[in-house]
Amino acid sequence: MAKREPIHDNSIRTEWEAKIAKLTSVDQATKFIQDFRLAYTSPFRKSYDIDVDYQYIERKIEEKLSVLKTEKLPVADLITKATTGEDRAAVEATWIAKIKAAKSKYEADGIHIEFRQLYKPPVLPVNVFLRTDAALGTVLMEIRNTDYYGTPLEGLRKEPGVKVLHLQA
């Protein structure tokens, strides 16, 4: 193991490492990482309190869940189930159905982000996650790009996040 450098020590990391050390079951660690990702990652995060350290903390939780998963789950479950206990095919089918039922590109974008927060490995086996993520991304791109060129310029300017620049000669 690499020597820990003092520059990386801080009270936030120490506090979270103590919380992570208390995780003893796959169910507990899965809920912990899902709650963490919903609260501290993505554009929809609920808090920026640990913005500098959230990736380090997420990595440590992922490590803990991975260890618990390999210690406590049957080998067959490692490649056929999510750590939530759900069957991989059911997860894939559920989320693809959700995004296909989306009424707008914004709703579809939210569904895709939520899937990533809840199922990013080690919660879901990597091969299943990547395949499902690609399928969701494909549907999202199709929704986003439907008749893009048919949208009037004024309609495009009203899209969330658009900033109109005026060039001066």
Swiss-Prot record:
Responsible for the initial oxygenation of methane to methanol in methanotrophs. It also catalyzes the monohydroxylation of a variety of unactivated alkenes, alicyclic, aromatic and heterocyclic compounds. It catalyses: methane + NADH + O2 + H(+) = methanol + NAD(+) + H2O; methane + NADPH + O2 + H(+) = methanol + NADP(+) + H2O. GO terms for molecular function: methane monooxygenase [NAD(P)H] activity. Keywords: Monooxygenase, NADP, One-carbon metabolism, Oxidoreductase. GO terms for biological process: methane metabolic process; one-carbon metabolic process. The lineage of its organism: Bacteria, Pseudomonadati, Pseudomonadota, Alphaproteobacteria, Hyphomicrobiales. It holds the Pfam family MeMO_Hyd_G. Its EC number is 1.14.13.25. This is Methane monooxygenase component A gamma chain. It comes from the Bacteria. The gene is mmoZ. M.trichosporium has two forms of methane monooxygenase, a soluble and a membrane-bound type. The soluble type consists of four components (A to D): protein A, comprising three chains, in an alpha-2, beta-2, gamma-2 configuration, is a nonheme iron protein containing an unusual mu-hydroxo bridge structure at its active site and interacts with both oxygen and methane.
